Amino acid sequence: NHIHDAPHMAVQFTGNDHLIAHNDIHHVCLESNDAGAIYSGRDWTWRGTVIRDNLMWEITGFENRGCVGVYLDDMLCGTEVTGNLFYRVTRAAMIGGGRDVLVENNLFTDCEPATHLDARAMNWASYHVGTTMKDRLDEMPITDSLWAERYPELLTIWEDEPAAPKGNIIRRNVCQGGTWDGVRDDARTYIDMSENYVADD
C-alpha cells in the first residue's frame, strides 16, 4: 500500500496477531501531533502483531511539531517492529510504557529520536493500570487453553509489577544521523538495548 498526505494516522490496529508489512507511508499526521503513522494502544491483551518491512518517511506532525512513526501507546505489549526503514520521523519507534516489545533490524536515518521507551504506567499514567488496563484484561479468556498457550505472559502480568515496562528489546538496529536514544531514565533498567550500530557524523 502507498499511504500519504493524510491528516491523521495511516494505520490503526486493535486485536491480535496482525501483519502490517510492505507499506510506503509518508506525509501523514499532517494535522495531528499526538498521533502515529501506525498506531495502537492501551490494552495488555493486544499481542502478536508484527510490523515489518515498511518504509516510513517525512512524518513530523502538524507544523513539524512532532508525532510518531510506530506508536505503541499506553502500555501496549507484545509487538514486533522489525526490518523497517525510517527517514525523518519524530519518535520513529515509540514504546509508551508497554512490555515484551521487540524493535530489531530497523534502519533509522535522521530521526528525532529513533527510539523511545518510557515508564508512564509507573508515574503519570498510573491511573490506567487498575482501571482500563485491568478491566480489559479481565474481559479476555486468558486462562482458556488457546489463549494461555499463545499468550502465557497474560497469566502472570497482574502479579508481575504490571506497571513496569519489562521485557522490551531494542537490538541490531542501525541509526544514521538524528538522535538514537530517547529512552527515559526511569525505563532504562527494564530494557535490553544491545548490538545497535549508531553511526558518527
List the model feature ranges, each with a label.
Residues H2-D201:
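Glycine- and acidic/polar-rich repeat regions and solenoidal domains
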